[in-house]
């Protein structure tokens, strides 16, 4: 490709509404342009990157037997009503009515459509297992689109769906998909982690997320320094190895005027923060003998003062209402509770986190305004309904697998795989004839990759003050840089420079390398700045002075090192 025939849409200034580095650099490098809130045009430079990511994803899906399909973005609302998600999904699901007064949705995901396809096309267990995938646009009506294409309303996604006669078959494909995702991110040269995850609105049982590690990531992930254990902080089990010591203090109420937080309390009493507890009161219900939900009641959740409540874990307590809802001020007053000073000796179920349950001589609220109680001890002064894991893990916690300690880092979710089970196949009556001649409800797996999101995540992980640095890949042909090599001929009165640049350009193309000849009528400084901004990994400068010595100036974008190389050395360098 010749630069004079290609759209270089670089910007000198950063758009004011670009809120993170990847968005700023993608706009400045001319990869994308904003059309409206959460909607972006992919320019030629950016589309080349997008298509390269799609190619790697497509190859790995096909390598494990995935069959590519293409489903419409517009979906009949009746399918979503049949699955039960039409109302559950919320306002992110864009609903509309066509001219014939029929209801439709703009697809944020395709579980319903693929299940409808499967129930119409799959007849026998002999056709299974089978995996279908597509790479296609999705639409989610985000309330606050932000971070460029990271959280856009319209985005490109690879979604795959597998169908099975039993759980054992699903687990085999799930592992194959896990391995394929691992290969995809390895081929892309990204620093990533696969972590245990929550199934969310998709539903199902087992689930893993794939995160690109970056300081700007929205998610916190915990991983061990002594094993391959990794999990989303929301799901990581919090281990407590401490044993409760015998009491050494008597309980005593102390005045704590205007103290609002545990941090203020610890400072006021000159004690370690971890020797305090906080009590959070949520809505709940009694559990009847038959296991059904009974009358409404309030439930107390107690964690250490230096820990935070994990709402996902708390929702797993049978007596806690879902979604987790904190008691209102009126409800607490009716129960005789003093907001900000709630203790642990309460006339309601009291669920205590493991770490808080290991405390002795701790400080809690006194159930009186401007008062706390020191020297509190479990069993002697307050009763525990049950000891549970209801907190987020923190840096330095013991790893749940017993190997090493946990580190916490930020991550950008770029992939998510689920074992759906029969949630959708049962709702949509998707069955095949089993080996025994009887109908079998299919088991399903669901596997998504944010194709466009990968690009933003890669830039968040790899950039400098001059622009994008595309990650070095094990195979140069897997590089997702729009061009891998740029040849810059310097202006000269002689034809030799351009002729040499043209010859080198043709040779590199013949070797199957992705090269651009920057023949634009621009100053060298402008060309160099553009190429650094876009992140072209290899830059070759052809000039009179260096050709006199049969040399080429080579610059590696990743380290900025300049070298004078012979033709043979140059060809060896850019072919790595």
From Swiss-Prot:
Catalytic activity of the protein: tRNA(Pro) + L-proline + ATP = L-prolyl-tRNA(Pro) + AMP + diphosphate
Protein name (Swiss-Prot/TrEMBL): Proline--tRNA ligase
Subunit and partners: Homodimer.
Domain of life: Bacteria
EC class (word): ligase
GO molecular function, one term: aminoacyl-tRNA deacylase activity
Domain notes per entry: Consists of three domains: the N-terminal catalytic domain, the editing domain and the C-terminal anticodon-binding domain.
Keyword Protein biosynthesis (UniProt): yes
InterPro entries xref list: aa-tRNA-synt_IIb (IPR002314), aa-tRNA-synth_II (IPR006195), aa-tRNA-synth_II/BPL/LPL (IPR045864), Anticodon-bd (IPR004154), Anticodon-bd_dom_sf (IPR036621), Pro-tRNA-ligase_IIa (IPR002316), Pro-tRNA-synth_IIa_bac-type (IPR004500), Pro-tRNA-Synthase_IIa_type1 (IPR023717)
Annotated organism of origin: Psychrobacter sp. (strain PRwf-1)
Keywords: Aminoacyl-tRNA synthetase, ATP-binding, Cytoplasm, Ligase, Nucleotide-binding, Protein biosynthesis
NCBIfam families given in the database record: PRK09194.1 (NF006625), proS_fam_II (TIGR00409)
CDD domains associated with the record: ProRS-INS (cd04334), ProRS_anticodon_short (cd00861), ProRS_core_prok (cd00779)
Compartments, as annotated in UniProt: Cytoplasm
Family annotation (Pfam families): HGTP_anticodon (PF03129), tRNA-synt_2b (PF00587), tRNA_edit (PF04073)
Similarity remark: Belongs to the class-II aminoacyl-tRNA synthetase family. ProS type 1 subfamily.
A biological process term (GO) from this entry: prolyl-tRNA aminoacylation
EC number, as in UniProt: 6.1.1.15
Name of the encoding gene: proS
Stated role: Catalyzes the attachment of proline to tRNA(Pro) in a two-step reaction: proline is first activated by ATP to form Pro-AMP and then transferred to the acceptor end of tRNA(Pro). As ProRS can inadvertently accommodate and process non-cognate amino acids such as alanine and cysteine, to avoid such errors it has two additional distinct editing activities against alanine. One activity is designated as 'pretransfer' editing and involves the tRNA(Pro)-independent hydrolysis of activated Ala-AMP.
GO CC annotation terms, alphabetical: cytosol
């Amino acid at each position: 490709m010749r630069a004079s025939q290609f759209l270089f849409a670089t910007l000198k200034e950063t758009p004011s509404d670009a809120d993170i580095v990847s968005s700023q650099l993608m706009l400045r490098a001319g990869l994308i342009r904003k059309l409206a809130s959460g909607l972006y045009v992919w320019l030629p430079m950016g589309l080349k990157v997008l298509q390269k990511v799609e190619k790697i994803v497509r190859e790995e899906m096909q390598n494990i037997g995935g069959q590519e399909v293409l489903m419409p973005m517009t979906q009949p609302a009746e399918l979503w009503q049949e699955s039960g998600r039409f109302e559950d999904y919320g306002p992110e699901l864009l609903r509309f009515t066509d001219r014939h007064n029929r209801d439709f949705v703009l697809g944020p995901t395709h579980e319903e459509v693929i299940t409808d396809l499967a129930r119409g096309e799959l007849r026998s267990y002999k056709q299974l297992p089978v995996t279908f995938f597509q790479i296609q646009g999705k639409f989610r009506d985000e309330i606050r689109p932000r971070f460029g294409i990271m959280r856009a309303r319209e985005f490109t996604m690879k979604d795959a769906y597998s169908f099975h006669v039993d759980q054992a078959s699903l687990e085999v494909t799930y592992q194959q998909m896990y391995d394929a995702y691992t290969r995809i991110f390895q081929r892309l040269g990204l620093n990533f982690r696969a972590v245990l995850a929550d199934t969310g609105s998709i539903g199902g049982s087992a689930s893993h997320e794939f995160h690109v590690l970056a300081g700007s990531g929205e998610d916190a992930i915990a991983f061990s320094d002594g094993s391959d254990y990794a999990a989303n902080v929301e799901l990581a089990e919090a281990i407590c190895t401490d044993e409760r010591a015998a009491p050494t203090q008597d309980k005593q109420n102390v005045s704590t005027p205007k103290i609002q937080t545990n941090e203020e309390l610890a400072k006021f009493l000159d004690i370690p923060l971890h020797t305090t507890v906080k009590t959070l009161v949520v809505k709940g219900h009694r559990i009847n003998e038959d296991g059904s939900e009974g009358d409404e009641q309030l439930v107390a959740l107690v964690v250490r003062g230096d820990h935070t409540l994990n709402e996902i874990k708390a929702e797993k307590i049978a007596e806690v209402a879902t979604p987790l809802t904190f008691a209102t001020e009126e409800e607490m007053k009716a129960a005789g509770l003093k907001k900000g000073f709630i203790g642990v000796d309460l006339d309601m179920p009291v669920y205590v986190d493991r770490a808080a349950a290991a405390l002795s001589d701790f400080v809690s609220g006194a159930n009186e305004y401007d008062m706390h109680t020191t020297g509190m001890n479990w069993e002697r002064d307050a009763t525990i309904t049950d000891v549970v894991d209801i907190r987020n893990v923190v840096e330095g916690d013991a790893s749940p697998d017993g190997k090493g300690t946990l580190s916490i880092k930020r991550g950008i979710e770029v992939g998510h795989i689920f074992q759906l089970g029969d949630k959708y196949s049962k709702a949509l009556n998707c069955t095949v004839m089993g080996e025994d001649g009887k109908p079998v409800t299919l088991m399903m797996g669901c596997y998504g990759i944010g194709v466009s999101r990968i690009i933003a995540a890669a830039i968040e992980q790899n950039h400098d003050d001059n622009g994008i640095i595309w990650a070095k890949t094990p195979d140069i042909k897997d590089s997702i840089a729009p061009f891998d090599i740029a040849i810059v001929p310097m202006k000269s009165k002689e034809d030799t420079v351009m002729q040499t640049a043209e010859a080198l350009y043709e040779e590199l193309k013949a070797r199957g390398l992705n090269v651009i000849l920057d023949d634009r009528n621009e100053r060298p400084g402008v060309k160099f700045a553009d190429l650094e901004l876009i992140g072209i990994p290899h830059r070759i400068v052809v000039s009179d002075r260096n050709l006199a010595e049969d040399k080429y100036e080579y610059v590696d974008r990743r380290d900025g090192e300049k070298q004078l190389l012979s033709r043979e050395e140059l060809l060896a360098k850019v072919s790595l």
